[in-house]
Amino acid sequence: MPKVYVSSVIDAPAERVWREVRDFNALPRWLPAVADSRIEGDAPPDQIGCVRAFTLKAGGALREKLLALSDFDYSVCYAILESPMPVSNYVATLRLAPVTDGERCFAEWTAEFDCEPSRAEELVERIGRGVFQPGFDELKRRVGRR
């Protein structure tokens, strides 16, 4: 099972960054590849089990289900239900932790999924460098100290 791991330090308190990522429907604000997003069935965006449907600026649509959300741990876990990527059993977690020597936080985003073995390396790279890292870069731009 391939694993993606990307981490970063953001020059903002974890609480401030969490306000951006906590909203399961807020991807267009901080994930550059996302054009628009909506929560199906008008469910609250923090309701476990809610499904977000979103489109990518480059084309393609995804549906993801919220599996866990913790204001205590600053973490969100979700699964891909439908995607143009050739993956299955995809589960990802984005987690924030305060850095104790200043108003910064450590952010990590992980994912595990199944795919054809010949595609694993390419997909890990594509997700890590093409999705997760640009998301962290945009969060730094939006909420980091200037």
Where are these regions (language model features)?
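A generic beta-sheet turn/junction motif
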Residues: 10, 57, 100-102
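Short acidic/polar mixed-charge low-complexity motifs
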Residues: 2, 58-60, 88, 103
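Beta-strand/loop substructures that line and gate deep hydrophobic ligand-binding cavities in soluble
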Residues: 81-134
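A short, structured loop/turn motif at beta-sheet edges
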Residues: 14-15, 68-73, 96-106
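Plant-biased detector of terminal regions, especially N-terminal secretory signal peptides
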Residues: 8, 24-25, 107, 144-146
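Hydrophobic/aromatic beta-strand elements that line small-molecule binding cavities or substrate pockets
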Residues: 6-8, 62-68, 91-98
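Hydrophobic ligand-binding cavity/cleft-lining segments
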Residues: 1-44
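Glycine-rich portal/gate segments that line the openings of hydrophobic small-molecule binding cavities
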Residues: 29, 38-86, 134, 138-146
